[in-house]
């Protein structure tokens, strides 16, 4: 870039016409291309959030009101979602009641479907993702999840929702959210 500027100032005179202007533009474009290529090849590592040991009792509970097939479907969904590394708690809610709790359990046995966060997610049928749950005022809406959960996702499906808790902030990638969405949709189909 410095050579192009020096060439323009000293060698081209006060007014550069035609060929000189085109050559200068090509030189600037080539230089910018090299700079952008170099920047695109820089290996940048994102800093992972600190993993937190979730406080709560470990366990699994399936509602006794479910049929054998529905209980099997609920266990399948929880197992599929728990394959995501950072997911430590899965809570399934369907037809007005909590049908499964698995992993590190929160203090409340039931999903509070009347809380603003859950009722909004169920009404609008759009996932609600809180990547930094400790910074969210609606933290109290997640009593069914461990108190020190770092991230949470509510994924609605027809008649219910899946709620998950993670052990670090910003833990769920778009791919993880898509996987939970597919599992929730299939669970909704099986339970209906």
Language model region names:
Residues 1-8:
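Canonical alpha-helical transmembrane segments of integral membrane proteins
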Residues 22-50:
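Transmembrane alpha-helices and immediately adjacent membrane-cytoplasm interface residues
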Residues 56-71:
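Short regulatory/linker helices and ligand/cofactor-binding micro-motifs at input modules
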Residues 75-90, 119-124, 143, 186, ...:
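Amphipathic alpha-helical regulatory segments at dimerization interfaces
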Residues 89-98:
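Short hydrophobic alpha-helical segments used for membrane anchoring or interfacial signaling
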Residues 97-153:
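Regulatory sensory and allosteric helical modules in signal-transduction proteins
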Residues 161-192:
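Juxtadomain coupling helices with adjacent low-complexity linkers
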């Amino acid at each position: 870039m410095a050579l192009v500027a020096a060439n323009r100032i000293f060698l081209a005179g006060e007014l550069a016409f035609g060929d000189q202007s085109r050559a200068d533009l090509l030189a600037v474009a080539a230089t910018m291309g090299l700079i952008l290529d170099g920047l695109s090849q820089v290996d940048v590592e994102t800093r992972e959030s600190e993993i937190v040991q979730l406080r709560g009792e470990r366990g699994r509970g399936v509602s006794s009101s479910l049929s054998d097939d529905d209980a099997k479907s609920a266990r399948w969904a929880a197992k599929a979602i728990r394959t995501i590394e950072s997911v430590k708690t899965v809570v399934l809610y369907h037809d007005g009641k909590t049908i499964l709790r698995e992993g590190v359990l929160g203090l409340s046995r039931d999903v509070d479907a009347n809380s603003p966060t859950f009722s909004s997610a169920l009404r609008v049928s759009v996932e609600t993702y809180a990547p930094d749950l400790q910074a969210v005022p609606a933290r109290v809406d997640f009593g069914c999840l461990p108190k020190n959960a770092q991230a949470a996702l509510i994924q609605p499906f027809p008649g219910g929702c899946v709620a998950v808790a993670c052990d670090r902030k910003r833990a769920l990638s778009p791919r993880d959210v898509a996987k939970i969405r597919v599992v929730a949709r299939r669970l909704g189909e099986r339970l209906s």
